[in-house]
Curated annotation (Swiss-Prot):
This is Uncharacterized protein y4gN. InterPro entries: RgpF. Keywords: Plasmid. Could have an enzymatic function. It comes from Sinorhizobium fredii (strain NBRC 101917 / NGR234).
Amino acid sequence: MDQTLSRRLFLWHNPQTDNQCRNERHMIHTSKIYREINRIGVQIKGLPDYWMGQARRISYDRVGSAGNTITEGRKPVSADMAILLIYQPRGLLESLFLQLEHLLSKGLGVVIVSNRKVLEHDRNRLSEYCHLIIERKNIGYDFGGYRDGILALHKRSIHPKSLFVMNDSVWFPIRKDCDLIDRCRESRSDIVGVFYNNKSKFPKNHHLQSYFYRFGEKVVSDSRFLAYWRKIPMYNDKRNVIRNLEIKLTKNFQLMGFGISSLYAPEDILKAFKNIEVRNIRPVLDYYISALGYDQNTFWSAYKNESPKGGDTHALPIDVPNSRVFFHFLDAHPEILIRKLNSPIIKKNRDKRFVAQRKAIIEGGFLKEIDAVIQKELINWDR
């Protein structure tokens, strides 16, 4: 009899294991109930902001945007432009200037949109890298800033061939030889993102993640593109921004007839997971259990008798496709994100998942694969 099947049958008939499984199922069921109750509560809490979104946008256009500070930069307009949304309340990071140098090296003209005022000396330094700097209140989060940047280009009659829209929630590029911009330019799709999130059971919720977009000429030259950005609500509840803007943007433009693609998809993560060398698999599995909350049953074959030793890592392909682990891109273990997928980005978020990821980067020897400027920031990020 197949050894893996034998172990499954043994554990199935083991009373101690049966009790443990029942307890685990009860805990998982209870956890799901609490998550669902919390989800409903969060939605109710966000309703006033949802209803105010359009009114806030109208008010902002009439009087609020008058408080924005506009500074002319020293760089010219380019055929391809980038809008870079930043929010750096503790002062501008050196990695921001690394990113700006990279964008300039790729021939992009840059519009900086800051969701807070910047110091005068920072503004002067930024102007050396940008065509335009817009300082605004943090109204509407990233999409509010994206909107101001796009409308500013239109007001100045700047019509780029391609428009890159991104924010500073990620370190980018993490390597000097990054080819993300080149790959986006080579794509025949009208809109390109880094990762296509399709973990939802509902296709309408499948979307490109909003920290990076490239809108091609067919999109930016279409009057519906500008109309879309003119009319978007301005939410001050981040959950509304995610649910009603980030998630819906992809489907809205697909319904307009534009083609969508991403540089990475869940299938790439699954393939990378399966190709991890046996000698490197243990810390990866431990990470998904301790940092991302997966139970050992997700990786049943490798955690025989609850032990991370002596399991059958060769049988992992049986277990992994049935889990949701391959929907994790930004918070993937660095063995997958950095080494296997050669990701151009790392998330800055201070959620415990990303704290654990940065710890794994530092302790797992992945720092050497990251630019020195970002290395320094990453090491000190959680202190």
